[in-house]
């Protein structure tokens, strides 16, 4: 009836716990365990289990492995789980009762006090690591909650389930964000724009230790160096794709800003400012007749993105920004301040609320609007 996809990287003890919880509460479920190039005994242990198995010889990240697992799934309904989660009683039943085509249903997380509180989750300490879990107390707590819970709210976070064909209809996760993170915020927005309903079941529960699968592999509460590197890269690619940063309401339901075609025209630009601003626009025009600044930027940044930076970073001398773009933002780098940067970060919201065709000035910017065409719907289907 349902297939669970569980990737893991060097998280064998956590993986054993989540697998045991599935076997206990959902023994009929199909389980797909995927080893992300682990260097511990993860793959050896996976091979001993009665499940669908897959191994990547190198670390590719859960952005890729979720999709591989869903490809391997033989059931119509698929769901993901993190290796550092355990499922509670009645987990599948309390998700599936809300499921229909073009719907994504997520569970409610119960987490130890490691992160700020939120209305989309419950903070309760049932153990801080794989070897201190109080599973009986967690299950008793879930059984108590299920006597009174039952409603839904509108929000989205892992773990979730949906129909396999609905997942594949929009092309799955975008490998632009491999290995991780931000692939989740990207696909949540694409689901909404594709017309899917996002529901959170308030009586389907997991206990989630948080961040052990990809962020805190070495020490709880401290980001791994690898995570810092790939997180920065993914964040810059998210901005290139969407033109604005992630925004959610208090229940973690995505708030989607318009995606406009925006170009910056910068006088006296330097390499640091080019690096800071290039992801926030579609095209950036600089004074660089000899191409020295462009070449230096390509050398350091092109390896971090599948976007062709030679099509994004252009010279003022050989191009006509106003003829090539819907919205053109002109300014002098010497006048650019932190306040200016704050405006850049909010520009899509400013344009949505008060933009109109014509010219206007704000802070150090001269803004020319030729069109307010929105392009976010072009991002729904991932064809990579």
Model-identified regions with their sequence ranges:
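A conserved acidic beta->alpha catalytic loop
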Residues: 34-44, 58, 288-294
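Glycine-rich, basic loop-to-helix element that forms the pyrophosphate-binding segment
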Residues: 56-73
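Donor nucleotide-sugar recognition loop
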Residues: 86, 153-159, 168-206
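A recurrent flexible, glycine/aromatic-enriched loop bordering the glycosyltransferase active site
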Residues: 141-165
